[in-house]
Amino acid sequence: MPDEGQSTQISVIKGDITTMDVDVIVNAANSGLSGGGGVDGAIHAAAGPGLIEECQELFKRDGPCAAGNAVVTSGGRLKATWIVHTVGPIWDLHGPVEAPELLTRCYHSSLDIAARVNASSVAFSAISTGVYGFPKELAAPAAVSAVASWLQVKAGTHNMQDIALVCF
């Protein structure tokens, strides 16, 4: 475990999350974990057919993944060892009060899983900002705040060194 004084670098970068050389990438998934469009589809395509099989098994065992929750699979053919799939809020469904709370839960749930698999580096895709309609101007500061609050609460309990918020 890191000592209390260890700091974690948080960065915002533009790039292709499917090519990131990190321990964990975080996928903006749908509740069925079935792949789809946008970054979810790109991650599934790059990871290969084994990923959809893993996701189907998780779905059969546990059912749909609710908004704010996260699950983990292997990274398939990606450089990342693990993929954390989190289901973000749908802005028009959850609304301006519940959606930000669920978005924070997405980041916290994902980081909890990343810590559990002993990750030192994590790259997040933009959660809920595509077809789920979460306004980008609200999602970006919410993401930074959620990561920062998780790091503060979990200080000394993880090995996280680098957390990237990846924009495309």
Positions of PLM-derived features:
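Phosphate/ribose-phosphate-bearing ligand recognition and processing surfaces
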Residues: 90-168
